Regions:
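Glycosyltransferase-associated regions of secretory-pathway enzymes
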Residues: 1-135, 151-281
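Small-residue hinge/turn detector
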Residues: 136-148
Length: 281
């Protein structure tokens, strides 16, 4: 199986669209008029910052994910590696290990105290006590503030990033098993107009979904509310000029355990892949 690593346009009509199915019946999600920034000057010509971001909050990080972060740094030596944490993530011994391996650890809640946007992000995070939900929001903000690439932490790193990872991108797949743009792996510049569109429309998306369950949030709706379904709606609405679409076989679904794309890791084509541990459930 052969496909380009980067495409400039994909067939949006083939993407799964849960917001056009049962959600509209309940809360008219597809009728939401999101507000967007002026994208006329967006041409994806700025090289991204050389940062890679991971998140682990809610419990002490385990050995598997600790080694994931360290291995990413060993492979991508020219990148700064950030692990975003809360007060539960690290022991003194683990912190020493990360520092000895040049991993930057930052408490996300120490970042959300300075301005109106940060307070807004903090308020959205606090609406639901589910770490998958919180991580969906955190990943958008940390890449907006620092720039670079976000990856879920249940990942395996195989080879260094190259020129394919210089410019803003999202990761997609369109095949017989699934067709979507997910949020487990993406890259944007600091202060990206696209990420600002994501962030500024979070509240409207979250509040819409909360209508389903008497102002509560149910776990099954998180991907539509803050995850891949949410960002896909915004990408389809705007079709940002020259945004890169990276096939997930090269960065998410190329692992040896996969059905369709296992050859990508076996043949050295994947840069990394994810193991889908469902660690936020």
């Amino acid at each position: 199986m052969k496909m380009d690593i980067i495409s400039k346009m994909i067939d949006f009509d083939k993407l799964s669209k849960p917001w056009f199915q049962y959600i509209p019946t309940l809360c008219k999600y597809n009728e939401l008029n999101f507000k967007y920034n002026n994208k006329d000057n967006y041409d994806n010509s700025i090289i991204m910052e050389k940062n890679i971001h991971f998140i682990w909050i809610g419990s002490v990080i385990n050995d598997k994910y600790m080694n994931t972060v360290i291995n990413c740094k060993k492979i991508n030596v020219n990148y700064s590696i950030y692990l975003w944490i809360d007060e539960n993530t690290l022991t003194p011994d683990i912190l020493d290990i990360f520092e000895n391996n040049n991993i930057i650890t930052k408490n996300i809640y120490n970042e959300l105290i300075n301005d109106e946007l940060e307070l807004y992000v903090y308020n959205q995070i606090q609406k639901f006590n589910n770490y998958g939900y919180k991580a969906d929001i955190i990943r958008l903000y940390i890449v907006y503030k620092y720039g670079g690439i976000y990856s879920d932490i249940d990942s395996v790193w195989l080879k260094p990033f190259d020129e394919n990872f210089q410019y803003e991108f999202v990761a997609y797949r369109i095949d017989s098993e699934c067709s979507d743009i997910g949020n487990p792996f993406f890259g944007f510049c600091k202060n990206s107009i696209i990420l600002l569109d994501f962030l500024q429309n979070l509240e409207k998306s979250i509040d819409c979904i909360m209508k389903i369950n008497d102002n509560n949030i149910i776990q099954a709706n998180i991907p539509i509310m803050t995850g891949g379904g949410f960002i896909s709606k915004i990408l389809i609405d705007n079709k940002y000029n020259n945004l890169n679409y990276m096939h997930q076989a090269y960065c998410v679904i190329g692992g040896p355990h996969e059905n369709l794309y296992s050859s990508f890791s076996k043949e050295g084509k994947s840069y990394c892949y994810q193991t889908f541990d469902k660690n936020w459930c």
